[in-house]
Amino acid sequence: MTRAIYLKAGGGYDNVFLGNLDISDPMNDEVQIRLHASSLNYHDYAVVSGVWGPSEQRIPMADGAGEVIKVGGAVKELKVGDHVCTTFFPGWLDGSPNVQGFETVPGDGIDGYARELVNLQTGSLTLAPDQWTHEQSATLTTAGLT
């Protein structure tokens, strides 16, 4: 069991609450991340405030950074102890994005990173820069590029 911040459907500051979340061990192609930081950007503000409120209950926050604490059996790219940051469009690693709206964006179309632990496929992560804090790394994928 871990904790998460939730946003009720439609958004709005009065619809944010702290709750519990069950988490299993990562699947064969996933890693488990202990999140240490998240950065706030306009997209998060718009979702939480209700400007772009979600159609169903959602864990907000599009960006996160933390440490790999468990690794699925098929994962070769990452290891326990690696510092990582999430990506705004999971699975988009290079080339032109194959994205339709915000359906795959954490904190909007899928649950985001306002939580303690998360299991993710490696295509949703990148190694954080050496010598950067989790707080600095959390700003890279959205806030750092806008």
Segment roles from a protein language model:
Residues 1-5:
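Short structural boundary motif marking the start of a folded domain
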Residues 6, 19, 46-49:
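Short, acidic/hydrophobic/Gly-rich beta-strand patch recurrent on exposed beta strands
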Residues 11-16, 42-44:
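Short N-terminal binding/cap micro-motifs at the start of the first secondary-structure element
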Residues 15-18, 112:
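Residues that act as N-cap/strand-start positions at coil-to-secondary-structure junctions
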Residues 18, 23, 65-67, 117-119, ...:
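Conserved hydrophobic/aromatic beta-strand scaffold that supports enzyme active sites
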Residues 23-38, 48-93, 109-112, 129-131:
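Glycine-rich beta-strand-centered segment in the early N-terminal region that forms part
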Residues 38-40, 73, 123, 145:
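Alpha-helix/helix-capping structural signal
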Residues 89-146:
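NAD(P)H dinucleotide-binding glycine-rich loop of Rossmann-like/cofactor-binding domains
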